Structure formats: C-alpha cells, structure tokens
Regions:
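Active-site neighborhood of glycoside hydrolase catalytic domains
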Residues: 1-44, 51-59
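Acidic/polar loop patches that form or flank catalytic/metal-binding clefts of enzymes
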Residues: 25-35, 60, 67-71, 153-159, ...
Length: 375
C-alpha cells in the first residue's frame, strides 16, 4: 500500500480490481463485479452488479458504466416467496407479484443514463438449500415473472394479464415434474386493530376474486385442522382470546393450497392502542407499531420479517394504553438477535407505569436477556 500510495483498504481494493481488469481485458474478457467495487474508484471497463439495493447501480450508470441490476429485494430467490414458508429461509419476502412489478431502470436515471442498465438478474444462494428440488421450489414460478418483467416493454406490462396466464404455466411445471412453489395460491393474512381496541382482527385475502376463503378455529392448538368443520369467510374475523385459526383458499369447492394457520397469544396489552416515539428502521418496519401488540409471537424465524420491528441508531420507546387501570404482575419483551445479519439485541429494557399518561414511574429495568427456543 505504501509503495502504491494507497490510503486505505478501499483504495487497495480499487488498485486490485483495476489491475486484474487489465489482465482480463488482455484475454478478451470483461470484468463483472459486485457493487463493492465502486468503493475507492471503479475500474475503467468494469460492469457493476448492483445487489445492495439500487444505489450502486445508479452511481455506476451515472459514471457511464454498464450495470446489471440484481437487488436483494426483489431478485434474491432464496428469500421467502410465502408468508407461510414450511422451511427456514435466509430471510426477506419476495413474492411473485413483487418480482413482476420490478423495473430494472431506476427513475433516478435520465433516459441517456438508463441505457447503461443492461438488464437484471435473479440469484439463488444455497446456504439454506439442501437439494435440487428445493432449488426448483425457489425458482418456479418466479422465473416466469422475471422473464416477462425483463422481456416486456414497460408500457405493456400487465400483472392482471400475467396472472390469468399463470395457471397454464403451472400446468407446464406439473408436466415437467418440477417442484414448483404453490405460494401464489396462499392466502394473504394481516392482523389489524379493532376500532374499540378490544381484541384484534384477522384479515384474509386471496390473489384473485375467483377464489373463496373458508376457515375454522382449533379449540386445542395441538389438534390438526379439519377442512370439513369450516365457515366461509366474508369479513375480517374478530379475535378476543388466545387460539389457533386455520384458513384455506378454494375454487369450485377444492382447496388450492396447504392450510395457513395463525396462532394468537393474548395478554393485557394485546390489541391495545400503541404509540412509538421513534420510527422503526425502513429495513424492518414490520406492520407498524401494532406489530408489538397484535397477539402474534413469531415462531417461523427470521423469514417472517413482518413480525419484527427493527430500530437503527435510536432507542425504541413504545407507549401502550391499556384503557383502564390494570394490575400488572410481569412484563415480557421478546427481542431478536442475529449477529451474522447485523441484528443486535438491546443493551437493556426498562418498563414504566403511569395512571394518567403524563407522570411515569420506572417499574423495572434489566439487561439480562434469556435465550428463547421459539425462534
């Protein structure tokens, strides 16, 4: 570094990239590198793969370098494509409709700068994939959405038309014997607050109006679902106590997917009015502040990111209005830690109580977090 006058590791990386690029160019090859190669200065003829969002691709295109857009969201196919995945994924949520909607030419670029975007690429990383069938599951049918997204002029893209044709494409997968994902048929579930803060609402939606929804409640959460003991869904279901609910989407009386289940664990704070004095990180917004009191405890691991709120560079302060004076015997706060993903648990947690919402008294503070086997 001293002999080359390099100030830091970024300039060292740039030196290496430029040197190896000259070698590759001499062999008639082109260097393609992840967007980290922007750090310290870009090699003259390098093509940039923009994976950490779109910022790297935008910067490279403005410098008149060719770019392949491959942002983790929505083009990492090892991310979940269902909110009800039955196996562990690396995290993230990239459903097929999100893939189809992606535009590889960022709006921040001028028409001339946009010409440097060669296209887009989807990636499948195999840390959580143990066999070829699982690879097929991650690829199909999202590959169809990727292909049409890239090959169709922007003005002709039509999700509704694509959706109508998707069942025929799925028949092809079946003819091939491909292990395609049926996540497209999954119900979309959302837990919402009630108007009077009594319990929560469980909202179910299908991808298409042609599909109907049926559901039932499992009195014993250990019992298996019973598709014959069901009710037809016509509006969000009000939940007022702990229990497990099962839902199916149907067409012409036949179930289209595996059942989707939701377990609710109620306490005094469930469904109550909650206010955050600091905003959650845009990378981990969950379903907003209500995520903390919606009665849902994440048992699916990090892939269920909508059940997490993340905070970056600021304390998390939540004010929960219980509505009436309540006797509190204990407070449990669930946190998540995964250092490999740069997610850290809080330094400490402090609980305050108030009778009027103005004067607060510290009730307890701890920095002793007990590891849970749930997540």
């Amino acid at each position: 570094m001293e002999s080359e006058g390099l100030k830091d590791e970024h300039e060292l990386q740039s030196y290496f990239i430029q040197r190896i690029e000259k070698y590759l160019n001499s062999k008639g090859k082109t260097l393609i590198g992840w967007d980290e190669i922007l750090e310290g200065g870009l090699a003259p003829n390098a093509v940039v793969m923009s994976w950490r969002g779109e910022a790297g691709g935008i910067e490279a295109a403005k410098q008149k370098h060719k770019v392949i857009m491959t942002p983790g969201s929505p083009l990492y196919f090892d991310h979940s494509q269902s909110e009800n995945e039955d196996s562990v994924t690396i995290g993230g949520y990239n459903p097929i409709e999100k893939v189809y909607a992606y535009d590889p030419i960022p709006k921040e670029l001028t028409e001339e700068e946009g010409k440097y975007i060669l296209g887009a690429q989807a990636n499948v990383w195999a840390e959580y994939i143990g066999n070829e069938k699982k690879v097929e599951y991650t690829i199909f049918p999202r590959m169809a959405a990727l292909s049409e997204m890239l090959w169709t002029p922007k003005e002709k893209k039509d999700w509704n038309d694509f959706e109508k044709r998707l069942p025929e494409q799925i028949k092809r997968y079946e003819n091939w014997g491909a292990n395609y994902s049926k996540a497209y048929f999954d119900l979309k579930t959302t837990v919402l607050p009630t108007d009077d803060y009594k319990g929560v609402l469980w909202k179910l939606e299908t991808k298409t109006k042609a599909h109907k929804i049926k559901y039932n409640k499992i009195l014993d959460i250990n019992d298996p679902p019973n598709p014959t003991a069901f009710l037809f869904y016509d509006k969000p279901i009000q939940i007022i106590r702990s229990g497990k609910y099962i839902g199916w989407s149907t067409e012409n009386g036949e179930n289209l997917n595996n059942s989707i289940s939701q377990k609710f664990s109620f306490n005094k704070a469930t469904g109550k009015k909650i206010t955050l004095t600091t905003e959650a990180s845009k990378n981990y917004p969950g379903d907003g502040a209500f995520t903390l009191v919606n009665g849902v405890i994440n048992e699916k691991g990090f892939s269920r990111t909508k059940e997490f709120l993340g905070f970056s560079g600021a304390n998390c302060e939540a004010i929960i209005d219980l509505g009436t004076e309540q006797k509190i015997s204990s407070v449990v706060v669930n946190t998540f830690k995964r250092t490999s993903s740069w997610i850290w648990q809080p330094l400490n947690t402090e609980v305050f109580g108030s009778l009027d919402g103005t004067t607060w008294k510290s009730l307890s503070m701890t920095d002793d977090f007990v590891e849970s086997k749930t997540v």
